[in-house]
Curated annotation (Swiss-Prot):
GO terms for biological process: axon extension; axonal transport of mitochondrion; cell fate determination; cellularization; centrosome localization; centrosome separation; compound eye photoreceptor cell differentiation; compound eye photoreceptor development. Residues 81-179, 1082-1106 are annotated as: Disordered. This is Dynactin subunit 1. The keyword Translocase does not apply. The gene is DCTN1-p150. Monomer and homodimer. Subunit of dynactin, a multiprotein complex part of a tripartite complex with dynein and a adapter, such as BICDL1, BICD2 or HOOK3. The dynactin complex is built around ACTR1A/ACTB filament and consists of an actin-related filament composed of a shoulder domain, a pointed end and a barbed end. Its length is defined by its flexible shoulder domain. The soulder is composed of 2 DCTN1 subunits, 4 DCTN2 and 2 DCTN3. DCTN1/p150(glued) binds directly to microtubules and to cytoplasmic dynein. The keyword Disulfide bond does not apply. Belongs to the dynactin 150 kDa subunit family. Residues 103-138, 161-177 have a biased composition (Low complexity). Its main location: cytoplasm. Part of the dynactin complex that activates the molecular motor dynein for ultra-processive transport along microtubules. Plays a key role in dynein-mediated retrograde transport of vesicles and organelles along microtubules by recruiting and tethering dynein to microtubules. Binds to both dynein and microtubules providing a link between specific cargos, microtubules and dynein.
């Protein structure tokens, strides 16, 4: 009965058991596939109480519940209300799903625990990174000599990070402060270090040498020079003291550098120790995971064993249920068999009545023909046939009208949908035009803004940017190094997450494989059920046809007997038969309606299956769907199996359509068509069995060959599809009842030749042969050929004129009869001795003998063709003679038949023709001997064949033999996995390439920057060169002027020297005169009164002359008129000396000032600022919140599962984590606060406007604003 009528609460009756009950459950169950109905019986004759295998479906008393199929129930009373049928059990969980859920819960628990451990490791990594940065920043910066005017100038870049002194580097407070400063430094406020200055030796003071022949003015100048040298020595001592202080500071810096190197070495050692600890932790983690996996595998094995035991118990219960169902089914079938036997007996009685009536009719018709009377009109039987045809035509007309109305309705519906789609398209086009207009406006606005931005950026700003870019890049390098360290930590966390996800993926794949296996089992059961349903439908169709025929005969009998009312009244059994016929007809009509509904449902299933296949093929790559690919290979296998199935249909329908002939007489040959139809059936079956032989071998080969051979076979799909149309044509002829003896078999012969050639071409390199199936097909083909040849020989016997028994044609026909009978007996014997198991492949025969049997079938096919052509031409000749001469006999001379047979042998055998007798006798003698050998071998080796087949099947089950389709599928899966791996590798390579491109771009930018610097340096060099040339010209002019003045002074000096020389000469002459006078005075001995005043002068003169004659000459030789000139010259020399000394001191001071300005300014430690500390702590919290927002994953499944979770881990997991949007807004606000604080502390870094202050370009780049 229909499953739609079965609802909970309905009253039903169990067919065949006379039990009443109430429906309590309708739906799917876990103990068997399909829909079951739970019935609460009125009597305690059930089998359960509503529960099976620990699962409660409904409640009732003990032994009052029973589960049956919907087809075993008959509805007595519908449900009182519209209660919904229970489609699935929601309160109980099947035991089969418990291991899977346990495995999922354990995997999820391990995943959550691994994530918690990863969060802890991530916190440790961030802490270590902050400590690393703190240790690097805790080293005190180098001190440098600040210039004297440092109060008026400000340093171009300062660091916000405060270095702790080296002496206090061990206490905890300093390390905590340094870690805070290090976390604050990570934002990019770094100071760019300048190269240190190593002062050179001080310049020596120039030496000044006096000429040896200078006068008193030179002595004064020497004194001044000594005085200046003393001053210079004092300055030199001051500078040496400063140099010593600088050297002392540099020595202190070197000691600090040594301490820094020591700390760096310790840091590297700690890093190595940390890596070793991390490696040991990773190995321990892996061992822990391995141990967990082993424990999980053991638990799964235990659960699987328990599940298997539960499945065994379920199977036992199912077997008992199936046994009971089989017993019930056997009872019903026994009842149906008895009713069918009674019906057959009744129909046999009716058939005998009809035969007697037809014989009487035939005798009356023969009497009318012999009497020369005209044939009467249409009989009642023919009239009834015409009425039935009219009724069928009317029904067809009504169906066509319904179909046309349905098509019109569909066309109107599609037209309405088309109009709706057009209106939607117009609306979308309007929306597109509006959006395109908006896009154009926005692009114009963007272009204007871009032009404004380009106009705002000037050349000077670009030069400044390029000049300062190196400093910014150094800052960025430091930032990037810190980011790289953080990313390496994140990479480690990511690798651990990937490992945990990989384990989860393996678990899910195992579950997916189990689900796919269950799905395949369900599909196999569904296919078996569909095959069973199809076989039953075929049987029902045959019975319906038989019932229809018998109904027609009964209606005819009813019409004939209606005229005789008295006899009908006297025979009450006929009335009973009529009533039963009417009841059966009504039952057949109801069955026909049910069949129509089933056909519609199957049509829906077929359309959905086709759509499913189309959707699945849409996911396949182009290589799968390409010509000669895997898709074509699958289609080839399906095509060959489909052609084999169609051949079976042709065989069965042809045997039913053309029954065998009881006796072949001359009247049956010349006046009827039954003999020719039977011969045609035999030939057709021979070719169909030959086609099946080739197809079976190709199908076996394609299921056992290499994948390359299968792909090669896929390329021949179009040719095979064309050959399939030949078989489809034969089936169409069978459907239209147009297949008869006049139909040609040339196409099927070409099809057989094509597939034999394809078998030899495709499977030539591989020895793949299904021997048993080939023998079975060849036996069927030989049997049909023998039947055809025997029918042709029988026709030849009755149409050849009787003559002597020694003629060639008669002898050949007798020989053919005897040998064909022998071959047919041998074929039947081989067929009986073949194993019934279809999975048996090997027969123990050599390949040469098996191929010889196929050749034997082909050779007998040639004999069959020759005999058929000769018989056909003979009948045509007889018909032509009858048409020309009605009095001629329906026979043919032996000589003419022999000539026709010889001509047909020449056409068929061509070059191998040796005459009919020779052709047939040699072949049939060899055929008998070969078939006897094969039959004897099958009889002797029957046990060996079966045992070898069993061994092969066991080996096949244990060896996991896979078909080429499975191998190709596994290969494609591996290729997809490799493709995914390659895609991941390619993505990594692309990321590396992008990084390299970024690095190359940075290098290109640096190169362009260096090029610009080079151009600027060349420009400055050219400017300096011009200035130098201009200065050289100036100095040349000054040199020439000075040289002219020197020449003039030399001339004046020479003149003065000449004048002085004349004065000296005059003084010498005067001196000599005075000496002469002095001598004269001494000789006279007279001393004058004024001589005492002059004597000291003379003494001093003599002393002077004795000590330093040169000086006395210079001192006392000058007259009174030359003293102003000498004093003026001395004054000029003093002025020149003072100017030169001042210029030299000024240049030395400038040089020292320039050298001191190149030194790095000393860092003055500032007291701790509360605002900076607050900003650092806020920044640290922001970083931790951002990292937690990236790694926090809340797993609801793990919470719902029954695993134990630590309270602290649960509290941390349930701790609220802010969203990324909130963190981003807070981060932007914090950045603006930091920038504001920085600009307040460093106002020179800001550009002041009328309304606000903005950071400069370098600050923007450092902060990445």
């Amino acid at each position: 009965m229909s499953e739609k009528n079965l609802k909970v609460g309905a009253r039903v009756e169990l067919t065949g058991k006379d039990l009443l009950g109430t429906v309590a459950y309708v739906g799917m169950t876990s103990f068997a596939v399909g829909k079951w109905v739970g019935v609460v019986l009125d009597e305690p004759k059930g089998k359960n109480s509503g529960s099976i295998k620990g699962q409660q479906y409904f409640q009732c008393d003990e032994n009052c519940g029973m589960f049956v199929r919907p087809t075993q129930l008959r509805l007595l009373e519908a449900a009182p209300g519209s209660r919904r049928s229970i489609e699935d059990v929601s309160g109980a969980t099947p035991t089969a799903a418990q291991p899977t859920k346990a495995r999922l819960s354990s995997s999820r628990t391990s995943l959550s625990s691994s994530r918690q451990s990863l969060l802890g490791s991530r916190t440790q990594l961030t802490t270590s990174l902050s400590e690393r940065t703190a240790s690097s920043s805790s080293i005190g910066p180098r001190k440098s000599l600040a210039p004297q005017n440092s109060k008026d100038k400000e340093s171009p870049s300062t660091s916000l990070a405060e270095g702790a002194p080296a002496a206090s580097g061990g206490n905890g407070a300093a390390s905590h402060a340094s870690s805070k400063r290090a976390s604050f430094v990570e934002t990019g406020f770094l100071e760019i270090l300048k190269p240190q200055f190593t002062p050179s030796q001080p310049l020596r003071s120039p030496s000044f040498t006096m000429p040896s022949n200078s006068g008193a003015e030179d002595k004064v100048a020497l004194l001044e020079a000594q005085k200046t040298s003393a001053e210079l020595q004092a300055q030199l001592a001051d500078l040496t003291e400063k140099l010593e202080t600088l050297k002392q500071r540099r020595n202190e810096d070197k000691e600090r550098l040594r301490e820094f190197d020591k700390m760096k070495i310790q840091f590297e050692q700690l890093q190595e120790f940390r890596t070793k600890i991390m490696g040991a932790q990773a190995s321990l983690q892996k061992e822990l995971l391995r141990a967990k996996q082993e424990a999980k595998d053991a638990i799964e094995a235990k659960e699987q064993h328990a599940q298997e035991m539960a499945d065994l118990a379920d199977n036992v219960e199912m077997i008992t249920l199936d046994k009971e169902m089989a017993e019930e089914k056997a009872d019903t079938l026994q009842l149906e068999l008895e009713s069918s036997k009674e019906r057959i007996e009744e129909l046999e009685v009716d058939l005998e009545l009809l035969r007697s009536e037809m014989q009487n009719k035939a005798e009356s018709a023969i009497g009318n023909i012999s009497g020369g009377g005209d044939s009467p009109g249409l009989s009642t039987y023919e009239f009834k046939q015409l009425e039935q045809q009219n009724i069928r035509l009317k029904e067809t007309l009504v169906r066509l009208r319904d179909l046309s109305a349905h098509d019109k309705h569909d066309i109107q519906k599609l037209s309405k949908e088309l109009e709706m789609k057009r209106s939607e398209v117009t609306e979308l086009e309007r929306t597109k035009e509006k959006l395109s207009a908006k896009i154009d406006e926005l692009e114009a606005i963007v272009a204007d803004l871009q032009e404004q931005v380009d106009a705002a950026l000037g050349a000077e700003e670009m030069v400044e940017q390029l000049a300062e870019k190196k400093m910014e890049l150094e800052d960025k390098v430091k930032l990037l190094e810190e980011e790289i360290a953080q990313l390496e930590a994140l990479e480690e966390v990511h690798e651990q997450l990937v490992e945990s996800n990989h384990e989860l993926e393996l678990d899910l794949r195992e579950e997916l494989d189990l689900a796919n296996g269950a799905k395949k089992e369900v599909l196999r059961e569904r296919d078996a059920a569909i095959e069973t349903i199809y076989d039953r439908d075929q049987t029902i169709v045959k019975f319906r046809e038989l019932v229809q025929k018998l109904n027609d005969q009964l209606t005819e009998l009813r019409d004939r007997n209606s005229s005789n009312e008295k006899e009908s009244l006297q025979d009450p059994s006929l009335k009973m038969v009529t009533e039963t016929i009417d009841y059966k007809q009504m039952f057949a009509e109801s069955k026909a309606y049910t069949r129509a509904i089933d056909v519609q449902l199957r049509q829906i299933e077929l359309s959905q299956a086709n759509e499913h296949v189309q959707m699945l093929t849409a996911f396949m790559p182009e290589s799968f769907m390409s010509r000669g690919g895997d898709h074509d290979s699958i289609l080839v296998i399906l095509l060959i199996s489909r052609i084999v199935f169609k051949c079976d249909i042709v065989v069965s329908q042809t045997r039913e359509r053309f029954p065998p002939v009881d006796a072949i007489t001359r009247e049956a040959v010349t006046q009827g068509h039954a003999v020719q139809q039977y011969a045609f059936k035999c030939r057709l079956l021979h070719y169909v069995h030959s086609l099946q032989c080739a197809l079976h071998q190709i199908l076996y080969g394609l299921n056992s060959c290499q994948p390359d051979t299968l792909l090669r076979a896929g390329s021949s799909l179009p040719e095979m599809v064309a050959q399939e149309k030949i078989v489809d044509g034969i089936i169409e002829l069978l459907k239209s009842n147009q297949l008869d003896e006049n139909s040609t078999t040339d196409n099927i012969e070409k099809c057989v030749a094509f597939f034999n050639a394809m078998n030899s071409v495709l499977l030539a390199g591989e020895q793949l042969l299904n021997e048993i199936q080939m023998i079975r097909d060849c036996v069927a083909s030989l049997g049909a050929a023998c039947e055809s040849i025997l029918s042709d020989t029988a026709i030849a016997k009755v149409i050849i004129q009787e003559a002597g028994a020694t003629s060639d044609s008669v002898l050949l026909i007798q020989f053919l009869n005897e040998n064909m009978e022998s071959v047919r007996q041998q074929v039947k014997l081989i067929k009986r001795r073949l194993p019934s198991d279809q999975h048996v492949i090997k027969s123990g025969l050599s390949q040469h003998k098996v191929e010889a049997m196929r050749g034997l079938a082909q050779n007998i096919s040639r004999i069959m063709s020759a005999m058929h052509q000769a018989t056909k031409q003979s009948l045509a000749a007889i018909v032509s003679t009858i048409e020309s001469d009605n009095a001629a006999e329906h026979t043919l001379p032996q000589e003419k038949y022999w000539a026709l047979l010889t001509a047909s042998c020449e056409r068929i055998y061509e070059q191998d023709d040796r005459g009919p007798t020779q052709n047939f006798k040699t072949l049939l003698a060899q055929a008998n001997s070969d078939l006897q050998l094969i039959a004897q071998h099958l009889l002797d080796k029957e046990y060996d064949i079966i045992s070898a087949a069993n061994n092969a099947s066991n080996q096949q089950k244990s060896g996991a033999h896979s078909t080429p389709i499975t191998q190709r599928a596994q290969l494609i899966k591996k290729q997809l996995e490799q493709k995914n791996v390659l895609a991941a590798t390619l993505e990594n390579r692309e990321a590396d390439v992008k990084q390299l491109k970024v690095a190359a771009k940075m290098k290109q930018n640096e190169l362009s920057e260096m090029q610009i610097r080079k151009d600027l340096a060349e420009k400055k060099l050219s400017v300096l060169q011009n200035e130098y040339e201009h200065a050289v010209d100036k100095w040349k002019q000054k040199y020439e002027e000075t040289s002219l003045q020197l020449q003039l002074k030399e001339k004046e000096f020479e003149e003065t020297m000449d004048h002085l020389q004349s004065d000296i000469d005059a003084l010498e002459s005067e001196k000599s005169d005075l000496r002469d006078k002095l001598k004269l005075n001494s000789t006279t001995g007279k001393v004058q009164p004024g001589s005492e005043s002059h004597s000291p002068h003379n003494i001093s003169l003599s002393g002077n002359t004795s000590t330093a004659p040169g000086i006395s000459n210079v001192s006392y030789s000058a007259p009174a008129g030359t003293a102003p000139v000498v004093a003026e010259e001395v004054e000029l020399l003093k002025n020149a000396f003072n100017q030169e000394r001042n210029q030299r001191l000024r240049l030395q001071a400038q040089d020292m000032r320039a050298k001191l300005s190149q030194f790095e300014p000393l860092h003055v430690p500032q007291p701790q600022d509360q605002r900076i500390t607050a900003l650092e702590s806020e920044l640290t919290r922001m970083k931790h919140a951002w990292v937690l927002s990236l790694l926090q994953v809340r797993s609801q499944d793990s919470v719902n599962s029954g695993t134990r979770i630590d309270a602290v881990a649960l509290q941390r997991r349930n701790q609220p984590v802010p969203l990324k949007g909130e963190i981003s807004s807070k981060a932007s606000q914090l950045a603006s606060d930091i920038l504001t604080e920085y600009l307040q502390r460093k106002p020179h870094r800001a550009t002041h406007g009328q309304f606000a202050s903005f950071p400069t370009v370098d600050v923007k780049r450092v902060l990445q604003i």
